[in-house]
Amino acid sequence: MNNKYELIVAAEKQFAREVTLGVIVQQPLSVWHYLIPGMFIIDFLRRTSAISRYTKHFMFPRQLAIDAAQRLLQGYEKESVNSRLAADIETWLNSLHLDSPQLAHAQQHAVELLIAHYSKLLSAEGTSHLELIENAYGSREAYLGHVRELTAAEAEIDRAIIEKMGNNEKLKEKLQLEAKQVELRRNRILENLF
């Protein structure tokens, strides 16, 4: 199971980096990048830091879910795993100044969907992430059902973030851009399955 765990974590980290790069590349360079020598290096460092930060935030709920799925498969009590998850999600959201019951609930729901997904992957046979998905779901339609459920849960998280942070156009634009990048990456995965 350890090898599968590592395959899943590596695939999710790569997915997070690709989404981040897609979001950052969409942001155009300012005129200062062409006029001020060295601005490229400053921007490169800033974007590298942003990629690292975003990947960390994108991975946090996924890492929680992967670890929880592994603990459940090892025989841990579901109640203790779920209570730890709820506490970890609340602490994480508080650290981001996103303490909202609606957001915590939406995040918990998404993590529960991911736990079910990762449990299937960890129980499946395969030597690659795509093989694990194919063997865990058995059909394109079954996997697509998971993707649709997860996408709806992520949209609910975005709505809760907007509600908490205020109806800010820049925030909405950033969340929409992120959702679009996630959709593009998931479609690419779907093209290679079944």
Please report, for each region that a protein language model flagged, where it lies by residue.
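Membrane-inserting effector segments that mediate pore formation, membrane fusion
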Residues: 17-59
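Non-transmembrane, heptad-repeat alpha-helical coiled-coil rod segments
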Residues: 71-93
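Active-site-proximal loop/hinge segments that shape catalytic or ion-binding/gating pockets
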Residues: 95-99
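Short, exposed interaction segments that mediate macromolecular assembly or regulatory contacts
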Residues: 106, 110-115
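Long, helix-rich, hydrophobic modules that act as membrane-proximal anchors or helical bundle/coiled-coil regulators
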Residues: 114-194
